[in-house]
């Protein structure tokens, strides 16, 4: 399931009204870069129906999104957010939460794909190690990798990554990047970030600025256009 057409209208501080056509797109990676406050997270809030637009429409598989129940819609998405969420329970339970009925072999395979298995093996009780509430007894990067492992188990066809490499050291960022590449295989992905280290992998890039979609295209197309995206990219990699 991928959005076939998004028309986003005025809602609160998000004053843009743009149409994004995904009708020809299959599984792929759509990066939404831009400055903080540009409206990137609003795109995700609309896709998840955390709130509804007041004008325009969002279509998913040909169905207007407001005609799809929130529960049904959200089963189609897996999210990895900047603010991770872990509960008081074992490492195994936190990963297995990604899919009801997952086997131990599947949980371990997900942890390996998420580049967190080796770390788990160093814990006092391995996968049976109990995490404190919200995982405060492990690092930010380790929490992020556990969240990615949980997402690995999900069967949902769409993935939303919101600032998934924020506030981690360079080594952990590399591990998270590798884990995300595994996670994104075969799914339609929306990656929201202003760090553009993996931007070249995106099938389509949406550049949101001041609440409007200012540019869209591939990395090469946007670099040739020499617009806001090109200036943002060059500023980060000079």
Q: What residue spans do the PLM features occupy?
A:
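Extreme N-terminal "head/tail" segments of very large remodeling/mechanoenzyme assemblies
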Residues: 1-42
